[in-house]
């Protein structure tokens, strides 16, 4: 069942930061995916080759921008990724990142099945100044009090013809205007008063969100938690809640606070974003891709031209079929 869903998701997507499936072929007992080859290997291995297994904040901002757009796109199609981590991200020969491995992904069947875009515009926006207890970043709210997921209107965000990337990303910095239509992706993914929430205990130990451990049900919020964990790992070479064993790690995730190592210089903007992404309560977590993009940490990112920019690290690739950046597997 999972592998068939993975096939359906790959067949539904068309995005510059998601690996492309060219064809799927099924035999009597096997299913084959013909996927875009990324000779840069796993992003995990690329990180491990860096000094102290971490990268500068400017590099992390670039890579986080690409993954943010990929996750936003999946949510707009009604999919929850559920297993974001460096091992599931591939590096294109150009150095850009490609999200891969949808084996744990979930389709929220009430909205977005078969790759259909989420429908639904919020009836209104109430402009309030809502500040996180630990943050000076203002989070716009809907009239129902939920954090809003605001996108600029008038664009087909899932049209597979032409350059879907420019339609997806828009141009430059967005202004949260009074008349901007709202697509609340988290409300759509978490529709029916939570009746369609996922309950499965899936994911990677150090990346699992508190609501998964608590078994309270979840939707797209888990992807923004793991996005925060990924950003932290890029900057610090380790995950923020790692314990001596699985139980200790779960206890840290559910009950503990994370700290920023004093030995590593991290901007206040980055710290603020991480606190918002790693809020333990789903209602307190930043789950709006548009508002995340507008956070001061991402100031200066040209979203519309991101894929045309030169990545910070270019993998060593001598020819298109080079395998040097992948692990060797013995029979």
Regions inferred by a protein language model and the residue ranges of each:
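Conserved N-lobe beta3->alphaC-helix segment of eukaryotic protein kinase catalytic domains
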Residues: 1-14
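A conserved loop-to-beta-strand element in the N-lobe of protein kinase catalytic cores
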Residues: 28-36, 44-45
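A short, aromatic-enriched beta-strand patch in the conserved N-lobe beta-sheet
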Residues: 23-24
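Conserved end of the kinase activation segment
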Residues: 193-197, 211-221
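C-terminal regulatory tails of eukaryotic serine/threonine kinases
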Residues: 111-190, 288-331
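Activation segment signature within eukaryotic-like protein kinase domains
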Residues: 63-64
